[in-house]
């Protein structure tokens, strides 16, 4: 996961997920329970008021909302994603969904939170303001938790077959973990742009990085759902996307009709400087 998008591309791409909101919710792997426990433990609080940025359909929201003492205000700019989020979190009075983007939203009465979390979404925020806004929305000593999943096809022959399909349809395709070999260490490394920006901002301390391996199994249709939810697929011309996904499905079917996704979740934690 990198952060090289410009403002126009970022604004366009962060709202393409709503085109396949249901596939996004059913297809994408969730987040490890251990990660949720570690984030809440890092706050050091028995009850946590959390602000979630780019909540999507609630993949992370539901995991945190299931924990006692956690209340969530969830920001999601895409109305289609927000609709799924509202539905999947219905009946949870401690979850509030706000259809807005992080950059323009302001909390009522300048309220500040114990925890700001963002799952698979922080790279879509505006680099020039995201860290200052995070500090403004957090209490002194509050926690920021940013995490991403990277997915890898563990079967070498299948991965090579899927990569060959992509190379045929998209010779200039952007890199993605799902087409790469499983690394020994998470690509969400300690020296990625996240800790560099956190430290450069000067308003955060106790910067911490953790990794969580997990395994998920997907059918051919399940993999197509995962791929369909990726931003660079959504940005393709429909005819190109449909042909690419159809040939990918045929490649998976030829290798047994299912696959194992080795998932590496990278988590970055930090605290706002006390007294900030």
Name the predicted role of every residue range.
Residues 29-48:
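Conserved alpha-helix/loop element of class I SAM-dependent methyltransferases that forms part
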Residues 51, 57-105:
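Class I SAM-dependent methyltransferase SAM/SAH-binding core
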Residues 114-128:
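A short SAM/SAH-binding and catalytic strip from SAM-dependent methyltransferases
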Residues 187-276:
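Conserved Class I S-adenosyl-L-methionine
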Residues 140-213:
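Conserved catalytic/acceptor-binding region of the Class I
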Residues 106-116:
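A short acidic, Gly/Pro-enriched loop at the edge of an enzyme's catalytic core
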Residues 18-29:
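Class I SAM-dependent methyltransferase Rossmann-like catalytic core
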Residues 130-140:
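A short glycine-rich, Lys/Arg-flanked "PGG" loop and its adjoining helix->strand segment in the class I
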